[in-house]
């Protein structure tokens, strides 16, 4: 089972939804980065459940404990271990799924591959595992901040409701003002109403999350394998419920002409820019200094209270199921910080690999 990602800045995720704890081990963060528990906790608070009507009612404090890697308020170059203990599991809600896979969940695949499958809360395949992503992402973002790189994520679409585009600073401010975490406050209200209506119906709804990174220098990534956009696509597709990834114009390039979307260069203050950013800040697998823009398509949470058809694998017969428990009517709001963290992990890794950040000591 693959649980580690990254080359120089690597992240190993551990734990399960209803196990004792979840978390991550981060290896390769250079020494002398100022870091404390609050830096990580404020990011975890953005993804923790039970914070609004558009998220799961499961109540978890999600308080992080740092077990290693920090000495006197700074990283010491050794692996950083962050752990969050689970406190509010309702495993009885899942006993009926021991032999009956839930539609559009990973249950059947896990059963087929591993045999011994922890079905409680989805086990290792639960969205709760992304706590590890956020712990690592908080550290990566703090590291990137030393090089003036900032990242913001927002929900830009829920169902057929789309947000209007705003500048980076406006989005950064507005996402903190609404439960949907959308940079367009008017659209956010409509999105919230749609999510709550689906919740009332016992259903769920999907959407799109956009992430923008500014301040990224030109030169990150490789031209063939380990392209920057390839690594971003890989980590973003590894987020639970993500079914599609776009960089820049994404699939819209299929209906465009080169004359419409080519990013033309110009010089300003002795620096190179492009007049447009159709490529989303990455051309030929390598960053070009423009904002890096990615989007993920997030499917509706498959755990819904409507009756669904499945099969009993022990009896080998059809079986109808109704999923009880505490589930998100839309995972997009909480997925924003996970997407942001994932992008930060990849950028931190490439910044070290490309020589922009010293691999062992920030003070060198």
Swiss-Prot record:
One of its GO terms (biological process) is aromatic amino acid family biosynthetic process. Reduced FMN (FMNH(2)). The keyword NADP applies. It is an enzyme of class 4 (lyase). It holds the Pfam family Chorismate_synt. NADP(+) binds at residue 47. Its cofactor is FMNH2. One of its GO terms (molecular function) is chorismate synthase activity. SUPFAM superfamilies: Chorismate synthase, AroC. FMN binds at residues 124-126, 240-241, 284, 299-303, 326. Keywords: Amino-acid biosynthesis, Aromatic amino acid biosynthesis, FAD, Flavoprotein, FMN, Lyase, NADP. Its EC number is 4.2.3.5. It catalyses: 5-O-(1-carboxyvinyl)-3-phosphoshikimate = chorismate + phosphate. InterPro entries: Chorismate_synth, Chorismate_synth_AroC_sf, Chorismate_synthase_CS. The keyword NADP applies. It comes from the Archaea. One of its GO terms (cellular component) is cytosol. Belongs to the chorismate synthase family. NCBIfam families: aroC, PRK05382.1. This reaction introduces a second double bond into the aromatic ring system. This is Chorismate synthase. It comes from Methanobrevibacter smithii (strain ATCC 35061 / DSM 861 / OCM 144 / PS). The lineage of its organism: Archaea, Methanobacteriati, Methanobacteriota, Methanomada group, Methanobacteria. The gene is aroC.
């Amino acid at each position: 089972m693959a649980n580690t990602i990254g080359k120089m800045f690597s992240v190993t995720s551990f734990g399960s939804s209803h196990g004792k704890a979840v978390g991550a081990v981060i290896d390769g963060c250079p020494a002398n980065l100022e870091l404390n528990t609050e830096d990580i906790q404020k990011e975890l608070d953005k993804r923790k459940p039970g914070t609004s009507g558009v998220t799961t009612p499961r109540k978890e404090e999600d308080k992080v404990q740092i077990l290693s890697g920090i000495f006197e308020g700074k990283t010491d170059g050794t692996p950083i271990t962050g752990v969050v203990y689970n406190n509010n599991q309702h495993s009885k809600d899942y006993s009926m799924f021991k032999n009956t896979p839930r539609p559009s969940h990973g249950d059947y695949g896990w059963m087929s591959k591993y045999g011994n499958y922890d079905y409680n809360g989805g086990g290792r395949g639960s969205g709760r595992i992304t706590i590890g992503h956020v712990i690592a992402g908080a550290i990566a973002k703090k590291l990137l901040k030393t090089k003036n790189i900032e990242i913001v994520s927002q929900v830009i679409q829920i169902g057929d409701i789309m947000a209007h585009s705003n500048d980076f600073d406006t989005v950064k401010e507005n996402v903190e003002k609404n439960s949907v975490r959308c940079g367009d406050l008017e659209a956010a209200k409509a999105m919230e109403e749609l999510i709550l209506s689906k919740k009332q119906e016992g259903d769920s709804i999907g959407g799109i999350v956009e992430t923008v990174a500014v301040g990224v220098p030109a030169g990150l990534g490789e031209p063939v394998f380990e392209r920057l956009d390839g690594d971003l696509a890989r980590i973003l597709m590894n987020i639970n419920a993500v079914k599609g990834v776009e960089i820049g114009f994404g699939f819209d390039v299929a209906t465009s002409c080169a004359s419409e979307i080519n990013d033309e260069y110009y010089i300003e203050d002795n620096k190179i820019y492009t007049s447009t950013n159709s490529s989303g800040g990455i051309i030929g697998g390598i960053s070009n200094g423009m904002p890096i823009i990615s989007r993920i398509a997030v499917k509706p949470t498959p755990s819904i209270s409507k009756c669904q058809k499945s099969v009993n694998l022990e009896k080998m017969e059809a079986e109808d199921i109704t999923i009880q428990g505490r589930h998100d009517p839309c995972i997009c709001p909480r997925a924003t910080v996970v997407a942001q963290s994932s992008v930060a992990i990849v950028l931190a890794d490439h910044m070290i690999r490309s020589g922009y950040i010293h691999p062992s000591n920030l003070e060198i």
